């Protein structure tokens, strides 16, 4: 965890610096949404209110819901899922046989700071405190490994001797069924989560002896010094143009829909569900996955226009939401949502009418990933070519489930056989014939095969040595222009009517 942690105040400063560079961007704080403005089936904006009862009405060509729980989906009239999906609907082996309305536990995060040896920052005992609720949070068996208390705290260690308190095992997770409640009723219920985190902080200080760790006084200006909002792991999930499931992630090349070809953000987190605080939740297990991408169609509602969905409210199954919910993923998905909106507005069309490849190209222009390649970084001169060609499926990748940071490999310096290459071309376009040969592909043979596929090359001296996948990707991109062929939201090449 600590590899991706930063102090909230530092993150806020960086985001504000980025936003300040956008001259046409106006940021307004302190308002919450009260309604969605619609004309027929199209969203036209939203109304807001603040704690002073001041109102705000915003009209927009495109409205994006980037809330944790899909707060405006119901207001917008967009169909959505909530809770665990059934095996029948998702075809996922680990999904429950019967759907239910159970969502993951949420957490109200605290930031503790080390005030130095000999200090006592113990807070007042919170109401309803019971040490037994937290017995087993450390020095207990977890997956047959002993977790001592120092390690429990260092799980969320940040710079400047600060600690994020977000601990699932006998920690400050809490189950609250609040998604469908009104704002007022939800806020009342969420007080329980704040109190439970304060109880855990008191336990850390009073029972475990870390009296020098107190609530950070330089992060949040809330009355209790806790975070501004809870960490929701799950909420409403829109029914979208595409529906990402565990199967699409675990085995991307053998699904009815080639959603990997339509990727707009990437992630490497495993399937991770928090349900320890709800005894009624079925155990789904943690099925392994490689790193993955999120398809563009998951951001677009099935039927409602003028509306884009981001964050955890995208069209993904309950099971795979355990991976796509993570903050690095939703940040990238948010970038893609803004890019999608920009492309739609520029072309004066609805999001569902955009060119998948145009959105992806815009993201690539920003050095964003559309394919989750671990071994080809944005600084690589061949990054864009390799991203594009793997997104066509002509050259394949190899996924790997690895600890808490999964991987997908391209192996840019490796060679492939003539058969592997022609199989990829055949899957891209059935007019291309498969050549059954285990001989390593040379530059000369690659050019011959690509010429038959319609590519054009200048007369050059071609090497008879095996060609690397890196150079092959560049060759395909420069000659065949495969990425320029339009695809639909399922990854199929569009046919001209």
Residue ranges and their predicted role:
Residues 4-8, 12, 66, 186, ...:
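Solvent-exposed, acidic/flexible segments
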Residues 1-35, 81, 104-110:
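Conserved N-terminal/central alpha/beta ligand/cofactor-binding core
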Residues 372-482, 495-497:
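Extracytoplasmic Gram-positive cell-surface binding/anchoring modules and repeats
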Residues 29-30, 40-45, 49-62, 66-362:
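Flavin (FAD/FMN)-binding glycine-rich loop and adjacent Rossmann-like elements that form
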Residues 21, 35, 39, 299-315, ...:
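Glycine-rich, acidic and aromatic/proline-enriched surface loops and short helix-turn segments
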Residues 2-5, 59, 183-190, 320-324, ...:
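Second-shell loop/turn segments in exported
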Residues 20, 68, 77-78, 205, ...:
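Sec-exported extracytoplasmic/periplasmic mature domains
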């Amino acid at each position: 965890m600590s590899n991706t942690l930063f102090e909230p105040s530092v993150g806020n400063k960086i985001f504000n610096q980025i936003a300040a560079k956008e001259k046409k961007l106006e940021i307004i704080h302190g308002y919450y949404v009260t309604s969605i403005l619609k004309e027929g089936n199209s969203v036209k904006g939203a109304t807001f209110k603040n704690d002073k009862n001041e109102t705000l009405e915003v009209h927009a060509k495109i409205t994006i819901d980037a809330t944790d729980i899909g707060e405006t989906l119901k207001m917008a009239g967009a169909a959505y899922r909530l809770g665990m999906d059934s095996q029948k609907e998702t075809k996922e082996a680990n999904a429950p046989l019967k759907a239910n309305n159970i969502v993951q536990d949420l957490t109200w995060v605290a930031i503790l700071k080390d005030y130095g040896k000999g200090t006592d920052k113990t807070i007042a005992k919170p109401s309803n405190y019971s040490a037994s609720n937290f017995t087993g949070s450390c020095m207990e068996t977890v997956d047959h490994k002993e977790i001592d208390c120092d390690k429990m705290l260092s799980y969320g260690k940040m710079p400047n001797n600060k600690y994020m308190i977000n601990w699932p095992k006998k920690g400050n997770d809490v189950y609250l069924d609040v998604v469908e409640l009104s704002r007022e009723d939800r806020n009342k219920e969420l007080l329980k989560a704040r109190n439970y985190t304060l109880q855990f902080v008191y336990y850390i200080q009073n029972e475990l002896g870390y009296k020098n760790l107190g609530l950070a006084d330089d992060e949040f200006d809330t009355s209790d010094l806790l975070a501004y909002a809870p960490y929701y792991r799950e909420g409403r999930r829109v029914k979208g143009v595409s529906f990402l499931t565990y199967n699409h992630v675990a085995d991307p090349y053998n699904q009815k829909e080639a959603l990997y070809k339509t990727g707009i953000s990437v992630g490497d987190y495993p399937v991770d569900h928090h349900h320890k605080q709800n005894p009624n939740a079925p155990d789904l297990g943690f099925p392994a996955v490689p790193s993955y991408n999120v398809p563009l169609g998951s951001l677009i509602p099935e039927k409602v226009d003028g509306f884009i969905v981001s964050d955890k409210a995208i069209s993904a199954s309950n099971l795979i939401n355990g991976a796509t919910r993570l903050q690095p993923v939703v940040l990238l998905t948010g970038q893609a949502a803004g890019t999608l909106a920009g492309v739609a507005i520029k072309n004066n069309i609805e999001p569902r009418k955009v060119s998948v490849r145009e959105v992806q190209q815009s993201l690539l222009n920003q050095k964003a990933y559309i394919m989750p390649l671990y071994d080809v970084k944005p600084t690589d001169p061949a990054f864009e070519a390799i991203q594009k060609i793997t997104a066509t499926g002509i050259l394949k990748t190899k996924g790997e489930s690895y600890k808490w940071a999964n991987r997908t490999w391209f192996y840019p310096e490796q060679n492939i056989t003539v058969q592997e290459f022609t199989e990829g071309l055949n899957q891209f376009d059935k007019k291309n014939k498969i050549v059954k040969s285990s001989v390593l592909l040379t530059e000369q043979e690659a050019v011959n095969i690509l010429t038959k596929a319609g590519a054009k090359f200048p007369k050059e001296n071609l090497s008879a040595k095996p060609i690397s996948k890196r150079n092959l990707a560049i060759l395909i991109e420069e000659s065949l222009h495969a990425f320029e062929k339009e695809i639909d939201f399922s990854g199929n090449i569009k046919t001209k009517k």
